[in-house]
Amino acid sequence: MIIKPKIRGFICTTTHPVGCEANVQEQITLTKAKGKIANGPKKVLVVGSSSGYGLSSRIAAAFGSDAATIGVFFEKPGTETKPGTAGWYNSAAFDKFAKAEGLYSKSINCDAFSHEAKQKVIELIKQDLGEIDMVVYSLASPVRKLPDSGELIRSALKPIGETYTATAVDTNKDCIIEATVEPATEQEIADTVTVMGGEDWELWIKALSEAGVLADNCKTVAYSYIGTELTWPIYWHGALGKAKMDLDRAAKALNEQLSATGGSANVAVLKSVVTQASSAIPVMPLYIAMVFKKMRQEGLHEGCMEQIYRMFSERLFRADGAKPETDSDNRIRLDDWELREDIQQHCRNLWPQVTTENLSELTDYREYKAEFIKLFGFGIEGIDYDADVNPYVEFDVIEL
């Protein structure tokens, strides 16, 4: 079939398998160009490995460090008449390229919050790898099914305490609007922590540890975002921030446990990037369009892949073997360039000036839109979007 982009809200409902493969190839090429990571991991589990930072982590491990990888994700395959999710095609492409280089690659399509997912991964590790030396936790899910009761819990992207009103961009109509978000209830805050906090990360490490499949020096990392006062009301000071603070709590507990055998647990605070997850957060698209333009001008721009390669090579797996620099809460900070005072001051000054008319001139909004559509495999140079493609793509994946 011929597949064209169809956008609804902040999601593109169609995906292009050839475009998604090209995205993965581009990240692999970038990783290889940067060279091998001297003390990199060799057997890596990525929970949430099909897009964004999780996918880049799997690529950094495999193509930057020749690691065997197991990827866990929840995606929909395509059929003969309907495209699957971008994450499905990304994972299929990763598997194809990894196997072509003789790298071990196993993928599990399942609910990562479930007991079954953890048991299946343990089984695979015991059978094929013996143990693993790194666990990346990179889940971005709006819903969590509690593994014991089966109850569905939903997260809320809402402020706490008072209604939040701010200048934002309507990405469908490409115009500046005033976005208003009502505050979260106590229940919504608690539910957001349940879905997006550190509990499931702890359950993963507990299951892996009890099964005896964590190597002595195993490192685990979970991803977070803090941002600045421009986005704090909706993010760090909102319901989502409470969940991210719970990740810090979990990291502390896990670090105590793992450091006893030479391992470590850290939260890595990353920069804002264009992902399906960030596009759903009110105000983030406009902030990203502003900050990206300034960071590009300063030569500091990084996408997911550049960020993660820097985290692997300059923080977690340094050539000199030293421990990564951390902040006072033991977090690895890769938002350092974004938070530079001159960059943030630029955004603060710009925010009140942006109108629908000058949006594309003052910010990188056009580039934001292009990067967003690229997540789904569209708008990539060298791909013939009028060509007939088969949306049904099979690969070596275990379905639970």
Curated annotation (Swiss-Prot):
Residues that bind substrate: 225
Cleavable signal peptide: none
Keywords: Fatty acid biosynthesis, Fatty acid metabolism, Lipid biosynthesis, Lipid metabolism, NAD, Oxidoreductase
InterPro entries reported for this sequence: Eno_Rdtase_FAD-bd_dom, Enoyl-CoA_Rdtase_cat_dom, FabV-like_NADH_b, Trans-2-enoyl-CoA_reductase
Family annotation (Gene3D superfamilies): NAD(P)-binding Rossmann-like Domain
Catalytic residues (UniProt): 235
Source organism per UniProt: Shewanella baltica (strain OS155 / ATCC BAA-1091)
Assembly and oligomerization: Monomer.
Reported function: Involved in the final reduction of the elongation cycle of fatty acid synthesis (FAS II). Catalyzes the reduction of a carbon-carbon double bond in an enoyl moiety that is covalently linked to an acyl carrier protein (ACP).
Pfam families xref list: Eno-Rase_FAD_bd, Eno-Rase_NADH_b, Enoyl_reductase
GO function term, MF aspect, one: trans-2-enoyl-CoA reductase (NADH) activity
Class in the EC hierarchy, top level: oxidoreductase
Sequence positions that bind NAD(+): 48-53, 74-75, 111-112, 139-140, 244, 273-275
Site (Plays an important role in discriminating NADH against NADPH): 75
UniProt-listed Enzyme Commission number(s): 1.3.1.9
Official protein name in the record: Enoyl-[acyl-carrier-protein] reductase [NADH]
